[in-house]
């Protein structure tokens, strides 16, 4: 299995520092305690958009996939901002569903959460049109959305659970999917700026997003973890974070 330099370095640091920090559950499997809905449509209500079903957070869509999708907003874990961490979760999507997991997100008045944060893409690759857009599959599941494709692309079909992990340490970020490392990149570097310049978040295409993302995490390089409501049925469970 491919192993990130970051993962090796973090492991060495943790060993040298004594006992490993314990992972903390962000979701108790029963209710949405600790989570806050940020809705873009005033006609929507948090209690119907986000529910708990069989021990999982369910984002409730139209049931019509892309044809009936309506962007609902985001669900953020509002109890704490995270800086260096390892986030693990499981997800599954309905047919044609689109969602994502945000990290280092900021609350910006008048702006949706997602424009301030990198996104671990969550998608039904086989049935959502976004899978064929972007460049080289960089809008498929586990990709850094619209910037880096997840390789290998090992997402399971809709209706099946996937395991996922995001590791962030001093600006180095690694995405994992179903037990495999699928990408690595470095925030706040010339590489990061170059990726933004080539994406839908470029200064020319989306200046508000660019200004936030170029220094994502803000002055302290920390932020919220969030789940995207893109108008489709998606489930998340076993959401755990370990601070590094």
Where are the regions that the model predicts?
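Bacterial Sec-dependent N-terminal signal peptides
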Residues: 1-22
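Carbohydrate-interacting regions of secretory-pathway proteins
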Residues: 17-244
